[in-house]
Amino acid sequence: MFHTIRPMLPDDLAAVLRVQAACYPPPMQEAPDVVSMRLRAAPATCVVGCDGDGVCGYLFAYPSRLGRVTALDAPFAPAPDADTLYLHDLAVDPRALGRGLARSLVAHLLGPGQRPALAHAALVAVQDSARFWGGFGFAAHATDDPGLAGYPPGAVYMARLNC
Ligand SMILES: CC(C)(COP(=O)(O)OP(=O)(O)OC[C@H]1O[C@@H](n2cnc3c(N)ncnc32)[C@H](O)[C@@H]1OP(=O)(O)O)[C@@H](O)C(=O)NCCC(=O)NCCS
């Protein structure tokens, strides 16, 4: 199916929150003001995927440090000495699943020549998505960040080398 990927804009937030609501159980829903602050903190690394009916997927990311976890519902704190693109939240609306949109969103930020050019990428895999992320070269990685404890059981911190 045809879809486009573009930078996320403030006007997209209502649709982004609808996708979040469709993709996560209540304990994992993040507050609208936190989501909005994240876009303001890292506009260069937050993107949406759109189909003919509008926004149907998104990816929030920001420059961080390897080993650091963003707690659920916490604002982004971009690192001045970043070495890692932290992918905080990737979600695709049920209407658009299985059509390569998640792959396109990830490739948009991690594909060759993309900026910022950081040595690593990392994330917390939730909802049985570790195998999905493994397909992009991510593997379980040690972290002692206390933010991981706030995630549901089964969440896995994963990282990869970007090159
Ligand atoms: C995980 C998610 C983003 C995948 O979206 P999608 O648009 O259906 O994924 P794509 O169509 O781009 O699939 C890309 C590849 O991953 C595979 N894949 C998709 N979901 C998968 C999963 N849960 N486990 C393993 N592989 C998966 C696809 O088969 C495809 O493989 P292929 O290219 O070899 O055919 C989507 O299921 C989702 O939004 N889930 C709810 C939110 C969530 O839990 N996000 C993870 C946050 S860490």
Where are these regions (language model features)?
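A short beta-loop-alpha structural element at the N-terminal edge
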Residues: 2-16
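Helix-loop element at the rim of GNAT/NAT acetyltransferase active sites that forms part
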Residues: 7, 18-31
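C-terminal "cap" of GNAT-fold acetyltransferases
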Residues: 9, 79, 126-127, 136, ...
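Active-site rim helix/loop that mediates acceptor-substrate recognition in acyltransferases
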Residues: 25-52, 56, 60-76
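Conserved acyl-donor/pantetheine-binding loop and adjacent beta-alpha core of acyl/acetyltransferases
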Residues: 58-91, 97, 144-154
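Conserved acetyl-CoA-binding loop-helix of GNAT-fold acetyltransferases
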Residues: 92, 98-111
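Conserved GNAT acetyl-CoA-binding A-motif
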Residues: 106, 111-126
